[in-house]
């Protein structure tokens, strides 16, 4: 089984198989999701103090904040699916 890993900025990596959504943090419902995750202890801040540009929601209900654009994360995910970029892939 292949474990696909995605770089979400500043050396932070998440499992591509666990991603449910990659969204922009601008809307009120997403801000509410972020606050609820913070209250539950399920928020992971991977921004290194920079502005949050992407919110990643996983199948385990963790919410991850990233400082890279959602389009960039999606592009990295799509290059993984094509098999053209295998730098961050690990075989189990």
Swiss-Prot record:
Q: State the superkingdom.
A: Bacteria
Could you tell me what this protein is called? Putative regulatory protein CA_C1717
Listed NCBIfam families: MtxBflmRegRemA (NF046064), PRK04323.1 (NF003315)
User: Hey, which family's this protein in?
Assistant: Belongs to the RemA family.
Native species of this protein?
A: Clostridium acetobutylicum (strain ATCC 824 / DSM 792 / JCM 1419 / IAM 19013 / LMG 5710 / NBRC 13948 / NRRL B-527 / VKM B-1787 / 2291 / W)
């Amino acid at each position: 089984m292949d474990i696909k890993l995605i770089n979400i900025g500043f050396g932070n990596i998440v499992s591509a198989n666990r991603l449910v959504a990659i969204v922009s943090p601008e809307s009120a419902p997403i801000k509410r999701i972020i606050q609820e995750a913070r209250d539950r202890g399920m928020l992971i801040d991977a921004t290194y103090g920079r502005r949050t540009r992407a919110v990643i929601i996983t199948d385990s209900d963790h919410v991850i904040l990233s400082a890279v654009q959602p389009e960039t994360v999606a592009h990295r995910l799509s290059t993984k699916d094509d098999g053209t970029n295998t730098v961050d892939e690990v075989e189990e």
